[in-house]
């Protein structure tokens, strides 16, 4: 009995010391604050929308209203259409000039994550349609795994990597290598535009 108790006590002491050596897994600031700081650091103009789920990923979108197109849609009574099946028909050649114009410009899509794998899984699918970025806590960028696995993948997919220090100050660690490359315009990009347009109007109304 005494031997078992001693081993348990020793293991508990080791676990406690290990926990003190590990950095906190909590983010240094709220997701919304870190996302806004990252958008500013990257020079993304527009509104930083609340976190939303797109393509099954939890991301933060930065977008701006296209004033002329928005005004035209108001005049036509063309509200945002979030139904993906409906929007998929808007790119058909026979509907050219007969569908509402895109009313927002997506400046970027980012993920605020505790681990780089989560961040890249969330943002890489959007790289075809917008600039992308991942914000990580500072300690996540100090690991061997980050250096040998994360950085090469981020370069390959053109994802900006940023880190947040314990005070929540965000710095750019790795800029995108795909800046200026043309973005795809297809049924998915048109649908993303409509969903973001809908969220943009909801956000503006809520803050009014």
Language model regions located:
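Catalytic cores of nucleic-acid endonucleases
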Residues: 80-157
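Acidic-basic catalytic patches of nuclease active cores, encompassing PD-(D/E)XK
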Residues: 1-94, 199-208
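A broadly tuned "polar low-complexity/structure-edge" signature
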Residues: 51-55, 60, 125-136, 141, ...
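Alpha-helical protein-protein interaction elements
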Residues: 36, 84, 118-121, 183, ...
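Non-catalytic C-terminal interaction segments of nucleic acid-processing enzymes
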Residues: 93-98, 139-141, 146-208
């Amino acid at each position: 009995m005494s031997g078992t108790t001693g081993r348990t006590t020793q293991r508990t002491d080791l676990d406690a010391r290990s926990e003190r050596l590990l950095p906190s897994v909590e983010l240094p600031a709220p997701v919304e604050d870190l996302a806004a700081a990252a958008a500013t650091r990257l020079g993304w103009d527009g509104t930083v929308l609340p976190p939303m789920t797109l393509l099954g990923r939890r991301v933060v979108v930065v977008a701006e209203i296209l004033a002329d197109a928005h005004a035209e849609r108001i005049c036509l009574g063309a509200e945002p259409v979030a139904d993906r099946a409906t929007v998929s028909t808007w790119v058909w050649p026979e509907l050219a000039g007969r569908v509402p114009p895109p009313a927002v410009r997506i400046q970027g899509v980012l993920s605020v994550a505790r681990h780089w794998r989560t961040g890249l899984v969330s943002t890489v699918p959007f790289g075809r349609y917008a600039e992308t970025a991942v914000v990580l806590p500072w300690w996540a960028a100090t690991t061997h795994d980050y250096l040998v696995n994360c950085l090469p993948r981020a370069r390959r997919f053109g994802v900006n990597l940023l880190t947040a220090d314990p005070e929540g100050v965000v710095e750019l660690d790795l800029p995108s290598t795909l800046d200026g490359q043309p973005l795809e315009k297809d049924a998915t990009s048109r649908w993303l535009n409509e969903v973001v347009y809908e969220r943009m109007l909801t956000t503006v109304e809520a803050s009014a």
